């Protein structure tokens, strides 16, 4: 079952990248990885092949926090991605372990804050807002771009901007649509 999930992940990633290549222009394409494939040789090979096929695309690989269990392997992944011209993002930051050690040792280009932290942030206590704001400042000081996930309301977006988020993602900015309608 796991191999099937990984095979599907590879197939969907290839389809997404090749179908989006003509539509992206200067915009980056964020792609998810299956936590079990992130450090595998087949993943490295498939990503290398996709880079050769579509060198014009600005790819960003999202690394889920559950995939990060070994700092040495993470550094190797970071070096590999850099060598093939792919940036990476820590996905779902704050959903479980904060991964502060990894932020310092293997800095990502983007840090995607989990939607669970930011849902109804406009209604949250000042203390919660301060914690998130301090984390955003830390991410910025480490040279990464903070991205707020799951933003649905303008009030949430404004609080996120005030906290220093550079990017937002969620239904406020657009709902999922078929690629051919982009």
Where are these regions (language model features)?
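A structural signal for short coil/turn segments at secondary-structure junctions
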Residues: 23-24, 54-55, 81, 85, ...
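Catalytic core of bacterial c-di-GMP phosphodiesterases, primarily the EAL and HD-GYP domains
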Residues: 5-75, 150
């Amino acid at each position: 079952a796991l191999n099937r999930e990984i095979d599907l992940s590879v197939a969907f990633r290839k389809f997404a990248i090749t179908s989006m290549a003509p539509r992206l222009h200067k915009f980056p394409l964020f792609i998810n990885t299956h936590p079990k494939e992130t450090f595998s040789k087949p993943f490295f090979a498939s990503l290398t092949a996709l880079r050769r096929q579509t060198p014009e695309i600005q790819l960003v690989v999202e690394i889920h926090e559950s995939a990060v269990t070994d700092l040495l392997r993470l550094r190797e992944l970071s070096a590999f991605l850099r060598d093939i011209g792919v940036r990476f993002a820590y996905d779902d930051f704050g959903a479980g372990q904060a991964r502060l050690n990894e932020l310092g040792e293997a800095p990502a280009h983007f840090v995607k804050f989990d939607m669970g932290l930011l849902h109804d942030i406009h209604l949250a206590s000042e203390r919660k807002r301060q914690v998130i704001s301090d984390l955003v400042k830390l991410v910025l000081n480490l040279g990464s771009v903070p991205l707020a996930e799951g933003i649905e309301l303008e009030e949430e977006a404004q609080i996120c901007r005030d906290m220093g988020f550079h990017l937002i993602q969620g239904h406020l900015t657009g709902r999922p649509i078929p690629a051919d309608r982009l």
